[in-house]
């Protein structure tokens, strides 16, 4: 699918529309096999932007570093940092994904109340160009509200959320990433879920690739159940941690109540303390894989930096079709307008 076609999809409209990804579940594959099957293509890369968060050994955010404290490596080659901003004020586009599967029924009211407070704080304290889109997911994915700065509209949609069967977590990430990709500024996904995926056509690797193509940072908020289940499957938590680390975000595992509010507050603080690093790639060796490995270093051993681990750019060889943009079947989506 072309970028223009994706921009006109149901997931980019102002009305709520239910979208279903049309690939069979047999698409799921192991990580090694997935890496071998990534199509080769060439994409013009100009300025590559990297958002970085730095913490000290106590886990506290560090927001006063200088440009000279950072080093950026593209496929192992050090790059000149052309743009540097502390506490960047680039506009935010936040996709808030809320799990409304049956397993979240007991926690859903607490989650939506806390998410409402999060959105109020985010939109009242930040850039007036900041915008949030709201998605819910159970057996399919619903765009409850397209990108807006209107908190009241988002609050109304949040309070109307109801549960259903199934958890199409990876499909939700994939579709939200597609909607985030054309937007300017910083792009973030905040995912409120209890963990596991049960209904997606996409797998974790396709979801991560879509987020990386969109330059989106993923913050999973994995809500611990009110009644602890010793036998609960934690595979979904590991997958979400994998995606967070691959995009420069970090996972949160709160219980409902004050811990959930604190997790949302920490996300806002982190977003307001990010460094923006940007470079024009040069001398980075081209590879068969379009994925360029990124590494951001800070020249102080007591500090730890979080940033996305790569981006999709030029590859050795000819031109091809960007595979991540051709895998949506428009005829296979379920579309439903909300009254």
Residue locations for each model-derived region?
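Short, low-complexity intrinsically disordered segments enriched in A/P/G/S/L with frequent Arg
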Residues: 2-3, 9-12, 19-25
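Scaffold/interface architecture of coatomer-like assemblies
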Residues: 34-339
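Hydrophobic residues within membrane-embedded alpha helices
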Residues: 6-7, 46
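Residue-level detector of intrinsically disordered/flexible regions characterized by low predicted structural confidence
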Residues: 10, 17-20, 200, 336-337
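Hydrophobic h-region of N-terminal signal peptides that target proteins for export
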Residues: 26-35
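Short, low-complexity interaction segments enriched in Ser/Thr/Pro/Gly
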Residues: 5, 12-15, 331-336
